[in-house]
């Protein structure tokens, strides 16, 4: 199996450690080619399959596997200890979200490259070797990703443009879905592009990506203010500002189910209509826009707020009963956006975590 290091002081990490998780990640030495960092929250069976996919790759690389358990209650940590004893298991006493949990894993990473792998994502044969080969061949590449496909082999968004008010408006309006082959309207998800051609892009999803450890040391870890969503967008932007490039490589294929951990935490009044996800996304969107675009955070929020308010009004006045019922969904989105604005004070601060 893989070779691993012991987690040491991070095995039963508590909350006080995480205030320093944004500090520079400086590898002591590169004992491995790749450190695979996997964050899991109540995804025991998927996590088992994910770890088995790492083994099935049969890679000749020196691989370190690090699993961060985000205070699961389904026996995930015990399963890792029993079935995958060579993995570095880090138990968090609280749900750290995506960014902070990965930051904790980065502290134990000793690979030349760090691979982010969701617990509901599965490597295919040769994916690790090709990832490392691409990074070795392009020293300016700070981070790269591959083709994300669903269990039914359907293509998932695997490389995107940075969020802007214009890009958000195109997606909200439905024009991106209506004209996916348009280079203008399909710009955010790059739906116009040939999925079989490699390309330099703005950012790649955190479900699977490979990061140069030296580059991570220069720009720092994930910004801990992002509990979930936008953390990888922020990291890619910081890497680009340091002169590194971000790449999409289609010869790397990863099967991704998607959204499993984010569905495991009950909160708010209910999780109906994706209210919880909307709240988390809007909080992170405001933090991101405020950090990188200043006062544009207000315009981004206002645009989406007005859009959903208009949708709620239109659906409420519809003669179609089913369409009128969906007005609740739009109203709930409006409510969550208002709460996100209050919680973050317009993107100026991150609410107490876990969200």
Go through each PLM region and give its residues.
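Short, flexible, basic/aromatic active-site loop/helix in glycosyltransferases
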Residues: 165-201
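Conserved donor NDP-sugar-binding/catalytic core segment of glycosyltransferases
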Residues: 125-158
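N-proximal low-complexity "stem/linker" segments adjacent to membrane-targeting elements
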Residues: 17-55
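Active-site-adjacent helix/loop segment of glycosyltransferases
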Residues: 241-324
